[in-house]
Amino acid sequence: IFTKAGSFSYANILRTSEDFERVKNVEVFKDEYKGVKNFTSYYYQYFFTMALMISIVYAFFAQRDNGMWVLTYGSSGGRARYALKQTFVLICAGALIHTIMYWSTFICSMLQNGGFADLNNPIQNVEQFAKFTYPLSKIQYVMLLYCVSLICINCISLIMWAFFVLFRNRNYALIVILIFSAIEQFIYYHIDVHSVWNVLHYINIINLININGTLSSYRNWGTGTFVFPVFSVIIFVLIILTCVMVY
């Protein structure tokens, strides 16, 4: 009512109305939701996966310590082939580790808390998804979260790999990454989502690893009449940054 046509606030109101229109026919009712709720709230499996990915990246650069990198990089096309092989191995390892960790955690949560029979019910039956604007079932959301979190983990792993390339000593690279992660964690927990600096909260390594919090919520960014979901902006920036770093 009090916003001006052509402003972001006005455009955001219209966009919000359109987005929630998608779930206007979703009927919410009480069911066995604790299995999915506890699983989506649990995030340690993502950090454990990232710890394993860091160890794999660290192992990639063992030749920096034994001097074999000179032979590898000095051969015809050696550096390019080696980089392609490492990229392929890293993506496959990320997919394998994440798949095992993700689905084993999901199964354990469902066995412990119940809810297998209600997986086809709307995800909005879980209170924390009250602002989720897509008419998905619980199992559909779990599969969506799997795909999105896999993209995030692989992108972050590739960025770390590219960062290791910048350092002659892999131990220095590891130390810098750990310090950066600690700073990101501090920022993530000390900048509120309503702050004018909330971009540092959302485009943050902690938020990217535990992407469910952003995926399941509703918030838009934009300027003028251009309105974009925060989640879409985060994934777009992550993919662009990954391509730039790997290139």
Give the label of every model feature segment.
Residues N171-E184, H201-N204:
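Central hydrophobic cores of alpha-helical transmembrane segments
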Residues A162-L166, V233-Y247:
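Junction motif at the cytosolic side of a transmembrane helix
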